[in-house]
């Protein structure tokens, strides 16, 4: 695998993408080298390159009548096991490196769910923050004027991501329907009134807690009464806080770009609902939480990983937990780290966790609940059915249990330590690899 990897590592300017590729290649090198047929078929060289990338301009008119221009992207990474599947991100930081990394990760994450979904990702450097509802609608419609020709229920099924919630998905789906004159399950994360699935908004957080709970159970540890640090305060964090509280844990932090809130009384009940109000305000800050709940403390400009807790759950964005943060958590005797955000931990943090034999699981395993429930939405759309919240939640729980079992199967080392990074990467890789081999050189 080293010769194939060296060509990838020489690339410049795609740091996020290279970070994701390196992590996977290091995990799979032993099992890859046991399969000479993979090398003969140049499997790695084919796997690390997207099938295709679409880049396009998105001109739209703001409320002042001025034309604005943003860049739009769709990365169709791999469809060996099903239609391309992955979210759309609207954020000023969006670039091709980030979307390639997300599409690459999505390929293996989707494989872990056992549902027939390939990997893809898309987005734009457009930021919804500070924009009016009318401006967001016009941008979404302009974005779809190009994207519609590249997506479809059996070709490529987008969903939401950072900056893209139910409102944006609704606007994009409406424009897609207008252009194609078809009502199909081309998007997931839709409103319940037009084909959406129950549990979808909270699914990533719910699934993350199901996985973390299984990690703890596997070690004979009960999650009840454990303290939890959560970063972020959007849908993912909200789902994680809700399910952690339901399982009997006590969440004591949330965070935003302005800093973090520490609430020693625990974030539960109406405080969880207030998280949604904070997000809906559009201000992207968590400081008002401490004003509303005086027992809570707001710490400006810092991350929550300095708080002594039993469980740490990054739920915000990539590389939000670094090596220094990891050392703080280890020093404070954290029991478990579940990376619910995509690539939430830096390589230095991951190395520290694994070197210290910590219970640590990567995003492609822990946060697969979101795309798993998207897959369940696709199934409901295809069958023209709607399942109850309990049916969806039960299926989600079953899928997350199955992902955990795959990680244990492939990640258990001779000394008994479970390397969840290795386990998740090998399990996802083997499924995609066998599918690619069976379909020939295409």
What feature does the model see in each segment?
Residues 91, 110-224:
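Glycine/serine-rich phosphate-binding loop and adjoining beta1-alpha1 elements at the start
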Residues 37-66:
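Structured beta-strand/loop patches that form or line metal/cofactor-binding pockets in enzymes
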Residues 382-440:
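Mobile late-domain/C-terminal helix-loop "cap" segments
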Residues 1-5, 9:
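Single conserved hydrophobic/aromatic residue that forms the stacking wall/gate
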Residues 274, 278-334, 339-342, 347:
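Accessory "access/gating" subregions that flank catalytic or transport cores
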Residues 191, 196-306:
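Glycine-rich phosphate/diphosphate-binding loop of Rossmann-like nucleotide-binding domains
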Residues 316-384:
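Rossmann-fold NAD(P)-binding glycine/threonine-rich loop
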